[in-house]
Amino acid sequence: MTLYIDVLTMHKRTSSVADAGRVEDYLTTIYRLEEALGIARTTDISRELGVTPATVSKVIKKLEEKNFVKRVRYKYVTLTDDGRKLAEQIIRKHRISEVFLVKILGFNDVEAHMYAHYLEHLPDVVIERAFEVIGKPSMCPHGNPIPGVERYKEELETLSTADIHQKCVVQRIAGEFVNILTYLHSLGIRIGSSITITRRGQRYVFVELENGSSIELPIYIARYIYVKCF
């Protein structure tokens, strides 16, 4: 009987942790999508989390009951004040962790993003001490703002909408979704990279990199890349 109770208690605790993690994943994904694209669609949430639209709808309904999110219209979701506050707390810890991993431990921007998912669960006092050690940065390694830190807001445009035949410098990779970060890293595209837009199609943006190589970037990825063009 005692063993049964212990196992049952452990199961409840594990389920509680898993549920909390799932809530955080959804809130931060919605936050990143709103930050990057201005809106969070069910289809985008589904793609970024690797779950079905039906699963997203089911979880969103539960988050709505907890007053973390609200449906703006069919297939659109936005964070409430409570949801945004919780998401910003997690995003702040995550982005501080990313800078620490890059600046102090020497990881690249993709590795830092992946390992920061573990560090973001450390106590606030640890994260804030790391924040001081790395010089209180205002941005993460991907150019995204760290919540709670004032910074100069520069006018940027996305690679998906910038005029062709312009030379642009990558200033920000919004959203920080691992599949996009990994893809861009494999191409050698990161913050500070120079890109020349040569042509734009319905589904692709054609660009030339500093090394002279030509690349077809899918529009859905180009919309996450914020640039300053000359």
Give the residues covered by each predicted segment:
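Mid-protein regulatory/catalytic core that forms ligand/cofactor-binding pockets
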Residues: 121-226
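Key DNA-contact positions within bacterial/archaeal DNA-binding proteins
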Residues: 54, 110
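Short, hydrophobic-biased segments on the C-terminal half of alpha helices
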Residues: 60-61
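Extreme N-terminal segment that seeds HTH/winged-HTH DNA-binding domains in transcriptional regulators
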Residues: 2-50
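A short, conserved structural fragment
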Residues: 64-72
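Basic, amphipathic "hinge/linker" alpha-helix immediately C-terminal to the N-terminal HTH DNA-binding motif
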Residues: 75-94
